[in-house]
Amino acid sequence: MEAPGVLLVMGVSGSGKSTVGALLASKLGWKFYDADDYHSEENRIKMAKGVPLSDQDRIPWLCTLHDILLRDVALGQPVVLACSALKKTYRDILIRGGSDAPLKSDDSAKEPLAGGKLLVVYLCGSFDIIYGRLLQRKGHFMPPELLQSQFSILEPPSAPENFIQVSVDKSLPEITAAVMEALK
């Protein structure tokens, strides 16, 4: 496979996106971004109160992330982004930017990241396993009570998206090895 310019490590809260993403970036020598660092203060407060984010809450955040990816890809800097990217439309915004036009995954003419291919790494797992992880996590603004809302809107990647699916039941070395193998 031709090496992508962007690895998008996605999944629900507690799936291991930040841990896996940071490790992959370190192994590859790529830049790492954690999308959680770019949430507005309003979004953080809303989630901390147990209120799920709406599309309107997420779109400006996704557009900011798109701009970061676009900038780095234009500079030839490969990137690993850890981001929930729960819906297909959210992943499309990360690739294409904008929020006011219908998004089509097969419309490569409007794909600003076309010069830097994107590989989606979908970290999947059962509600019970991930909920158990969230109960162990301390100091994060996303409470375990919001996990069901994430599973409710989750649209796992599918063709024609460029993706691999890796189970969170695997160990961290097994997960990173699966991604590294997919990059060969």
Swiss-Prot record:
Catalytic activity: D-gluconate + ATP = 6-phospho-D-gluconate + ADP + H(+)
InterPro entries: P-loop_NTPase, Shikimate/glucono_kinase, Therm_gnt_kin
Transferase found in the keyword field: yes
Pfam families from the UniProt entry: SKI
Entry binding sites for ATP: G11, V12, S13, G14, S15, G16, K17, S18
UniProt keyword S-adenosyl-L-methionine, yes or no: no
Gene3D superfamilies: P-loop containing nucleotide triphosphate hydrolases (3.40.50.300)
GO molecular function, one term: gluconokinase activity
Superkingdom field: Eukaryota
Keywords per UniProt: ATP-binding, Kinase, Nucleotide-binding, Transferase
EC number: 2.7.1.12
One GO BP: carbohydrate metabolic process
Pathway: Carbohydrate acid metabolism; D-gluconate degradation
Family: Belongs to the gluconokinase GntK/GntV family.
NCBIfam families: therm_gnt_kin
Protein name: Probable gluconokinase
Organism: Mus musculus
Lineage, uppermost ranks: Eukaryota, Metazoa, Chordata, Craniata, Vertebrata
Gene, per the UniProt record: Idnk
